UniProtKB/Swiss-Prot annotation:
It is found in: Cellular thylakoid membrane. Signal peptide: none annotated. It comes from Prochlorococcus marinus (strain SARG / CCMP1375 / SS120). HAMAP family: PSII_Psb28 (MF_01370). Part of the photosystem II complex. This is Photosystem II reaction center Psb28 protein. PANTHER family: PHOTOSYSTEM II REACTION CENTER PSB28 PROTEIN, CHLOROPLASTIC, PTHR34963.
Length: 117
């Protein structure tokens, strides 16, 4: 069952909110139905908290519930993990709207802004 959170949070490990604030980039298909959000976490605490490589995905929690992706990769510098990159995919307009509600709550919870390039 999804955990309901008053503040929007992101987790790579169960029970541990990620404190590293990601860079987030969005892309959408021409018709706007599908798209992706790309997250890059530089030096996330999840990398220091995990010893056995057991990051299984990224979960995003807010007052509506949980969004989850299993598409997570580690980026290495000189053989040492330095960043986590995650991709969240939506396949409908309603999925996109749900993600945007999470993103706005996450931004508000973490003092972030939104800009279009």
């Amino acid at each position: 069952m999804a955990e309901l959170k008053k503040n929007a949070t992101i987790r790579f490990l169960e029970g541990i909110d990620e404190t590293s604030i990601p860079e987030i980039r969005l892309t959408r298909s021409r018709d706007g139905r599908t798209g992706q959000a790309f997250f890059t976490f530089e030096e996330p605490q999840a990398l220091s908290a995990v010893k056995d490589g057991s990051i299984q995905g990224m979960s995003m929690f807010d007052e509506e519930g949980e969004l989850k992706t299993r598409e997570v990769k580690a980026r290495f510098v000189n053989g040492t993990p330095s960043a986590l990159e995650a991709t969240y995919v939506w396949k409908s307009e309603s999925d996109f709207q749900r993600f945007m509600r999470f993103a706005k709550r996450y931004a508000s919870s973490n003092g972030m802004g939104y800009s279009e390039k």
